[in-house]
Curated annotation (Swiss-Prot):
GO terms for cellular component: cytosol. InterPro entries: ATP-grasp, ATP_grasp_subdomain_1, D-Ala_lig_Van_CS, D_ala_D_ala, Dala_Dala_lig_C, Dala_Dala_lig_N, PreATP-grasp_dom_sf. Belongs to the D-alanine--D-alanine ligase family. Its EC number is 6.3.2.4. One of its GO terms (biological process) is peptidoglycan biosynthetic process. Keywords: ATP-binding, Cell shape, Cell wall biogenesis/degradation, Cytoplasm, Ligase, Magnesium, Manganese, Metal-binding, Nucleotide-binding, Peptidoglycan synthesis. Coiled coil: none annotated. The keyword Cell inner membrane does not apply. This is D-alanine--D-alanine ligase. Pathway: Cell wall biogenesis; peptidoglycan biosynthesis. It is an enzyme of class 6 (ligase). SUPFAM superfamilies: Glutathione synthetase ATP-binding domain-like (SSF56059), PreATP-grasp domain (SSF52440). Mg(2+) 1 binds at residues 297, 311.
Amino acid sequence: MKKNLMLIFGGVSFEHEISCKSAYSIYLALLDLNKYNIYPVYIDKCTGVWYLLDSVSDPPKPINTDVLPIVSLLPGFGIFSNNKNLEIDVVFPVVHGRTGEDGAIQGVLKVMDIPCVGAGIIGSAISSNKYFCKLLLKSFDIPLVPFIGFRQHDYFLDKEEIKRNVKEVLGYPVIVKPAVLGSSIGINVAYSENQIESFIKEALKYDLTIVIEKFIEAREIECSIIGNEKMKIFSPGEVVVQDFIFYDYDAKYSVIPGNSIIFNIPAHLETNQLLSIKEYAFLTYKNLELRGMARVDFFVEKKSGTIYLNEINTIPGFTDISMFAKMCSNDGLQFKDLVDNLIDYAFQSYINRKKRIDFEN
C-alpha cells in the first residue's frame, strides 16, 4: 500500500523560486518511484498560506492560488484540505531559507507527530544561523575563517568600535553577510573601510545579526552527506567560478554566456585534504545532531592549502544545477534512489524517537 507523502515548497523566503525548482525535480523522482501518493503543498510567497496542488509544474510557470484549496493543520487530528483529512504519513519539506531550514517547519511537524525528511529542530536552527553555528563549531575545533559577529542593536550603540574591530581583528578585504539566509543572498566584499558601513546596512535589510569574515582567495569545495546515526559521506566536488568574485546568488542562478561556472566532481584534492574535508564534514554532521541530509561547504585557501569550513545547508538545492545530488550521483546513487533513501531516513528517525517517548509502555 502506498504511503501518503506531502511535498512542501515555496515559502515566505528570498529563495522561494529556488524552492519551486527543487520541488519540481523531487516531484518527478517521486512519480518515477511510484511508491507514494503525492500531495504537493505550495506556500504562498506573500501571505504564507498553504495550498494543495494536483501536481508540481515546471517553474517558472505561475501558480494561481485563487482556485486552490487551503491546507489546515490541526495538532492531534491531522492535516486537512476541503474538510478531508489527508492522512499524511511523511512530509518532504523543500522550503529553502526562513521557515524551511531554520527549524520552523520541523517544529510544526513535530507537534503534528508526522515524520519529516531532513534535519530536526535543533540541527536546522543552529545550521541556519551562520554566527551561532560558527561559535558552536569553533568549540569543536573545526577550522573556520577568522570572523566577528554582532546584532543590529550593538552596531547602532557603537558603530566605530565594530568598524575598528573589523580593521584590527580581520583586516581588509572582508565579506559581510546576514547571519540567516542561504544562496549567498545579501553578501558583499568590502575592500576598504569606506565600503564597510554601506555593506553592513545592506546586510541588515535581510537579518538583525551580521557576520563579517576575512576574505581569502580560496577554492570552494562542497560535500554531500546522507543518513542518521550511520551516515554516508560522498566524494566532494568543487565549484569553479569564472565571472564572479565568489559563488553568490547571481553566480548560482543567473544565465551567463560562455558557461561561467564549472563543476568538478570529484574535486581535485590532495589525499590529506580529501581526508580532512570528510573528517570535518563528519564531525559537523555529528556535533550539530543533523540527520537525513546536509551539504557541508568548505574553503581551501589557494596559497596555503588550508581548509576552512564555510557553512552547512540542511535542505540543499535539488535543481538541475545543484551540487548535492550531483555528488551523490557521481558515487553511484541516482537521483530517484537518493530521494527514496531520504524518505526512509525520515521514517527511521521518527521510529527511533517514538521508542524514546512511548508513554504507554
